[in-house]
Amino acid sequence: MVQRDMSKSPPTAAAAVAQEIQMELLENVAPAGALGAAAQSYGKGARRKNRFKGSDGSTSSDTTSNSFVRQGSADSYTSRPSDSDVSLEEDREAVRREAERQAQAQLEKAKTKPVAFAVRTNVSYSAAHEDDVPVPGMAISFEAKDFLHVKEKFNNDWWIGRLVKEGCEIGFIPSPVKLENMRLQHEQRAKQGKFYSSKSGGNSSSSLGDIVPSSRKSTPPSSAIDIDATGLDAEENDIPANHRSPKPSANSVTSPHSKEKRMPFFKKTEHTPPYDVVPSMRPVVLVGPSLKGYEVTDMMQKALFDFLKHRFEGRISITRVTADISLAKRSVLNNPSKHAIIERSNTRSSLAEVQSEIERIFELARTLQLVVLDADTINHPAQLSKTSLAPIIVYVKISSPKVLQRLIKSRGKSQAKHLNVQMVAADKLAQCPPELFDVILDENQLEDACEHLADYLEAYWKATHPPSSSLPNPLLSRTLATSSLPLSPTLASNSQGSQGDQRTDRSAPIRSASQAEEEPSVEPVKKSQHRSSSSAPHHNHRSGTSRGLSRQETFDSETQESRDSAYVEPKEDYSHDHVDHYASHRDHNHRDETHGSSDHRHRESRHRSRDVDREQDHNECNKQRSRHKSKDRYCEKDGEVISKKRNEAGEWNRDVYIRQ
């Protein structure tokens, strides 16, 4: 009967009957007290259930769950984007695509535009994770000390340009504003990371020594600039161990000694600008084998100038610089308070003259021709390391000091008199690490050295002249028209004027090399490749009691006419000029009173001894090492060796123009 009632009753009645059966079982097992409590709780539960039963027989729990389902479906319906939201999103996408299309078009147009200026980078930058590039995938990555050609400004955050390396195409370069913002964001993240780590951890040893370097090196993807290039790591690695001690000590934080130890870290955070403006074409500067102004050095460099003039005809400007451009340090030119100190010092060149020369070199480089400087006062790479010229330093090297000694002595008594100062200068160059030079020419034969230098410059030419920008440069004809050199000594003398006008003549014409003629033999040089910045300038160096004339002093009494005319007529007789030159120099320097007469005697005896000494020098120099292959920083792959175009002279055998 119970089963019949259950089958006829609704499901809720069956549930109630089942509960009653359970209660009966509990009454049989539970004690009286527990039975009363269970009955009371059952009664209350039954009343609650009856009170929340729905009209359809469902309980309150069912009703609640159903209401949740209905509410969720309503919410999901109302969260769908409206028509206005969809149209707004489409408009944004259309604007983004249009901006990208315009940026791509501007990028294409910039390929044929001339280079506006060039910069050398002081930081590294990776575009791998950049998401705000005007054209995705077109940002340019670079390392510190790379060179960039900038075509134009795209917006406040991006420039258009290219990396000066063969095979690199035009793209977007982050502007200094963008790099500075990235640097600040990165520093802020580093500080926050250090703060949170010091709060959460009890170990204070990582607060300065470990957290800061690691947070810098694990740069978040959104921060692509490499802050390590600013040199902070070097200072942090020097922090003493007691500042990394895990023992928290008040003295270690507040003592003056601790503050002194931390100061270098904060001083280093004086950020270097991300870019330095440099000439569009890096000027080539020759140094070595010894001091300029002496016959051996001048003869070897003159042979290279002649070769370059013929090899790169139409693509090269060779210009003479008489001002002391080593004074053109950025810290001096940008700081007016230092100008008076330089002006009061005993220098040959005024700052105005130096500044004018620097501007002229920049203007020559805008033509994107190769620029070669015959710089009178530059004898060491350190002299130009802090200037804005970023030169290609070519080291003309004689590996054996004995060979250099023989060469100097073979030039006569006037040169042997200054043997010591020349040997000291050569030794200082030999002590420089190879990284200070871009090219080291240490070959025994002139033609090998010339081809080595030509290979490097050909690679540099290709790096600065990509196929996509092969249009003629409108600046070229204008610059060359204002910088041409007179072709004869007569024209040179008419255009130059007196010695007093020499230093104020700012035309400093581009030099034509002399006609290639065979002449006597002097020797050699070996050469390879590298870069610049080391010991102090020594063009005015003195060694013990034997004091040699530096190039700087010698040119004080030499006329511009005698220098320029010698480039055109290398075989003319210089005896009268040199006698006058040394006579006037005795007024300058009383310690060299016998210089003029010894030079005259040297002119008479030099030709008699040259043939014998030449053969001895040649045999000894041939024992030197064979040529090292240059590592070309402008080629991404090994370039082909350019076929040799031999000059008329086959060795370092030219009796070229000698500057004393």
UniProtKB/Swiss-Prot annotation:
* The name this protein goes by in its record: Voltage-dependent L-type calcium channel subunit beta-2
Q: Which Gene3D superfamilies match?
A: P-loop containing nucleotide triphosphate hydrolases, SH3 Domains
Pfam families from the UniProt entry:
Guanylate_kin (PF00625), VGCC_beta4Aa_N (PF12052)
Q: How changing residue 535 to L affects the protein?
A: In BRGDA4; uncertain significance; affects channel activity
Q: In which tissues is it expressed?
A: Expressed in all tissues.
Origin organism is Homo sapiens (Human)
Intrachain S-S bonds: none
Q: How does it sit in the membrane?
A: Peripheral membrane protein
PTM-bearing positions, type Phosphoserine: 204, 207, 218, 550
Q: What is the lineage of its organism?
A: Eukaryota, Metazoa, Chordata, Craniata, Vertebrata
List all Low complexity biased stretches.
55-65, 197-209, 486-495
What PTM annotation applies here?
Answer: Regulated through phosphorylation at Thr-554 by CaMK2D.
Query: Composition bias, kind Basic and acidic residues: at what positions?
Result: 560-602, 610-623, 632-641
What subunit structure does UniProt give? Component of a calcium channel complex consisting of a pore-forming alpha subunit (CACNA1S) and the ancillary subunits CACNB1 or CACNB2, CACNG1 and CACNA2D1. The channel complex contains alpha, beta, gamma and delta subunits in a 1:1:1:1 ratio, i.e. it contains either CACNB1 or CACNB2. Interacts with CACNA1C. Interacts with RRAD; interaction may be involved in beta-adrenergic regulation of heart rate and contractile force. Interaction with RRAD regulates the trafficking of CACNA1C to the cell membrane. Interacts with TMIGD2. Interacts with CAMK2D. Interacts with CBARP. Interacts with CAMK2A.
Question: Where can this protein be found?
Answer: Cell membrane, Sarcolemma
Q: Which residues carry this modification: Phosphothreonine?
A: 554
Gene symbol of the encoding locus? CACNB2
